[in-house]
């Protein structure tokens, strides 16, 4: 309810920064200023009157059509390219992404406090990592919340899928080499200490 009562100051859409939202490569690719930000399209709080008035759906589709083959993140790139100057940034807890759990994600330090609060007290959880809660190998700290609702559906008794063995083995090997001190993981892939307790099985 709080989300729907947000005053967006006549912006077309309320958004949350992407988990790599301050990565300069986004702005080099899309051709606008880093100061405008790069948002995640998993949650969009739309002012439909503004969208209709400015014909934004058509503009997004036109952008997609004219940039075929150049959209690394598909609809998300197109939405950012069209709407970067017509957004209202919401607290990050409304789209809490997996990389918010990391020590050093591609997010400016000025946003870290908001990011930490979103990780520890999320309102909407966005399972953005490759291994999802419906994969047996999932070790997301909040996977149990997903299961709570999954069990209430008609699919709740289905067996979980197995993630790609090749992809999962790569993850395990990287973690093993990191623990042995042979090859350190890049900082953006290292979880903050308070979340390691979820990984001790």
Where in the sequence are the language-model features?
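A glycosyltransferase accessory/donor-loop signature
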Residues: 41, 50-201
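Short, P/G- and charge-enriched loop/turn segments at secondary-structure junctions
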Residues: 28-34, 109-114
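N-terminal short leaders/motifs
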Residues: 1, 33-35, 74-78
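A recurrent flexible, glycine/aromatic-enriched loop bordering the glycosyltransferase active site
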Residues: 32-43
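Short, conserved loop/helix-junction motifs that constitute active-site signature segments
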Residues: 5-8, 36-37, 55
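Conserved donor-nucleotide/metal-binding helix-loop-beta segment in metal-dependent transferases, i.e.
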Residues: 1-30
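Serine-hydrolase catalytic core recognition
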Residues: 47
């Amino acid at each position: 309810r709080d989300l729907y009562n947000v005053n967006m100051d006549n912006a077309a859409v309320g958004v949350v920064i992407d988990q790599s939202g301050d990565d300069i490569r986004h702005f080099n690719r899309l051709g606008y200023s880093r100061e405008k930000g790069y948002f995640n399209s998993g949650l969009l709080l739309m002012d439909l009157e503004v969208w209709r008035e400015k014909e934004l759906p058509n503009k997004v589709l036109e952008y997609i059509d004219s940039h075929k083959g150049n959209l690394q993140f598909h609809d998300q790139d197109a939405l950012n390219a069209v709407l970067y100057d017509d957004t209202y940034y919401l607290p990050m807890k409304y789209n809490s992404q997996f990389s918010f759990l990391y020590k050093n994600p591609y997010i400016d330090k000025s946003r870290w406090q908001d990011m930490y609060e979103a990780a520890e007290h999320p309102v909407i959880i966005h399972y953005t990592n490759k291994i999802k809660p419906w994969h047996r190998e999932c070790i997301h700290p909040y996977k149990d919340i997903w299961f709570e609702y999954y069990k209430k559906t008609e699919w709740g008794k289905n067996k979980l899928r197995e993630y790609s063995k090749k992809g999962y083995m790569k993850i395990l090997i990287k973690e093993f080499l990191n623990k042995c001190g042979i090859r350190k993981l890049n900082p953006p892939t290292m979880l903050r200490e308070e979340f390691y307790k979820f990984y001790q099985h």
